[in-house]
Amino acid sequence: THPGIYGSSILGEADQRIQIILLDTRYFRDDLDRNTLTDQEKKDVGKVGWYQPTTDTSRTLLGEPQWVWLKTQLRKPAKVRIIVSSIQTISWEKGMECWGNMPHQRTRLFKLIADTKAQGVVLISGDVHFAEISKTDEGPYPLYDITSSGLAQKPHPSWPKAINQYRLPGCLYVGENFGLITIDWATKTLCLQACDVQGQPQFTQNVAISALKVK
């Protein structure tokens, strides 16, 4: 046992091995910097939240013990790795809780994926009360963050209008939803979707597993 709530699991064998990594982004987290924008100023720049990126690189999101643990996990063999974060990893401009409030920690995560040569990483997140997919080329290969939320709570009307330069075209859904990742081992493809309460996909993004490798 250890402080915080984080862990990992391995599913499948050999060429169909999946690793699921659950991160704790709250227990060890240092305080966030709050912005001082008025509601109108937020609207003008596309922000909806209360926070802003810090310049204090001594602050931590995961805590050093969890970082050490994560490095060990990413070195384990797996074809697909699903990293679960309660807050968005890629998108950072909204002013909401996200990895981008500590830019040095966000950068550290991307660098750790590269340094450990961890292939097949896909990020999943929630918290924002709508669904979207963000993509960045800041990692060793294209990184995708599929965000889904919530199952039983409608979004605030302004939140889906928040800025996100990383959002893939067509990959935004406003309404109760859940995320779905389907792995097709025959075609070696990941299918990332957000589904409505009837289970109908509202957007789909296919990703070749072969594209998620450190060169």
Would you name each region that the model predicts?
Residues T1-K215:
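Metal-dependent phosphoester/phosphodiester hydrolase catalytic core
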